[in-house]
Regions:
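Short, solvent-exposed loop/beta-turn-alpha elements that line the ligand-binding surface or hinge
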Residues: 109-135
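N-terminal secretory/targeting leader peptides
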Residues: 23-113, 140-373
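Absolute protein N-terminus
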Residues: 1, 22-23
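Bacterial N-terminal signal peptides that target proteins for export
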Residues: 1-8
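Sec/Tat signal peptide C-region and signal peptidase I cleavage site
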Residues: 16-22
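Cleavable N-terminal signal peptides
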Residues: 9-10, 20
Length: 373
């Protein structure tokens, strides 16, 4: 019986780690399929890759956490449950201290296009980041960025005084520290629970991207949205690959993935911002009021950005990051570079943006060696 159980467990482990079929690989995302970070970067991406590889690389997309829950996506791609996955870095601060260090610098530049491209370049090229991915058994494929986070509330929040004491759903990390800095009460709950919190009154505000007005139906339970840009989220990766899967591809197949990730990096940003515009328009039509932050609230955010850098460095040091101040300096330089590169580019032109991602990032990678050596 002991031999049978051991053999059964071994076979089960092999079955879980193997692709769904000989020519089909698992792609995991915990957002719903209708979300812009899944529609393009996973559903459309899978179709485009299959077409360009003549079906030799075919992904089966699992969305809405149907394959892996959010906190398990890093481990799941490492262990081969998924061959590619999205991962939100704040779920694994101990495993990904560098990814969280730069991810918590979300207030330095709140332009989501800039941050999507900058986080991608950093993750693909920065030596300390590459070492961190390797230590976790993941090949980094590309980054992302949400649109700006706003306060969506069931009570008017316009001034610094209005913010004080408000219970705000925050994404953790720097966002929670900002809430405390301005006298609010940070509440850590999944985005799937924002609606209930606002509806029952356990939350006063949800701080999230404004497409949540539609995607999480928040427009039914909020009365106002403050346009103070409270950072944007880009910690972790949009595509992280299982090492064995990646190294089993040909260089030509890896080049296809590079090309298509460049395209979807651009496409998801264009689509995300379009979804935000649609959601805000729909919510205002339904009666939501859009409020501008007062000068005191804007100044409080500016003061926080300066003050919080010390906390970022302290947290990173406690997690074993060497020279975190230099990492931040280097990342700021990458951000500033992308701010300049994107200055005159049409933010709605997916092809132009994708070409820029290729020429400045992906075409500079060696498909023979990246993630292999």
């Amino acid at each position: 019986m002991k031999i049978f159980n051991t053999l059964s467990a071994t076979l089960l482990g092999l079955a879980i780690a193997a692709p769904a079929a000989a020519d089909e690989f698992n792609a995991n995302h915990f957002f719903a399929e209708r979300h812009s970070m899944v529609r393009g970067p996973y559903v459309d991406f899978a179709k485009r890759v299959a077409d360009r590889t003549n079906g030799e690389v075919t992904f089966r997309v699992f969305s809405a956490g149907s394959l892996l829950p959010p906190a398990s996506s890093l481990q799941g791609v490492r262990d081969g449950v998924a061959q590619v996955s999205y991962h939100a870095g704040t779920y694994t601060p101990a495993e990904l201290p560098i990814a969280n260090l730069i991810g918590n610098m979300a207030f330095y530049n709140t332009d989501p296009m800039v941050m999507a491209f900058a986080s991608t370049e950093f993750g693909l090229t920065y030596p300390a980041a590459l070492a961190e991915w390797a230590d976790n058994g993941v090949v980094f494929g590309g980054g992302y960025s949400t649109s700006q986070y706003f306060m969506m509330c069931n009570t008017p929040v316009e001034t610094l005084t209005d913010v004080e004491g408000k219970r705000m759903r925050m994404a953790g990390g720097a966002w929670s520290r900002f809430a405390e800095f301005v006298g609010a009460v940070p509440v850590s709950i999944p985005s799937s629970e924002m609606y209930t919190g606002l509806d029952t009154g356990s939350l006063d505000c949800a701080v999230a991207t404004a497409d949540a007005l539609d995607s999480f139906s928040l427009k039914d339970v909020v009365t106002s949205m403050n346009t103070l840009a409270i950072g944007n989220y880009y910690a972790g990766f949009e595509w992280g690959y299982n090492v064995g899967f990646w190294q089993g591809l040909t260089a030509e197949q890896r080049r296809v993935l590079f090309d298509e990730m460049a395209y979807e990096l651009a496409q998801h940003r264009v689509a995300f911002d379009a979804d935000v515009a649609t959601a805000v328009a729909s919510a205002t039509d339904a009666g939501m009021t859009v409020l501008e932050p007062d000068a005191a609230l804007q100044q409080a955010l500016a003061d926080f950005v300066v003050a919080d850098e010390a906390a970022l460095i302290e947290n990173a040091t406690s997690r074993g990051v060497e020279n975190p101040d230099q990492v931040l300096t280097d990342f700021k330089a990458i951000i500033d570079r992308w701010e300049a590169l994107l200055k005159d580019v049409d933010r709605t032109d997916t092809e132009a943006l994708a070409d820029l991602a290729r020429s400045e990032i992906y075409d500079r990678l060696d498909a023979d060696t990246y993630g292999v050596n």
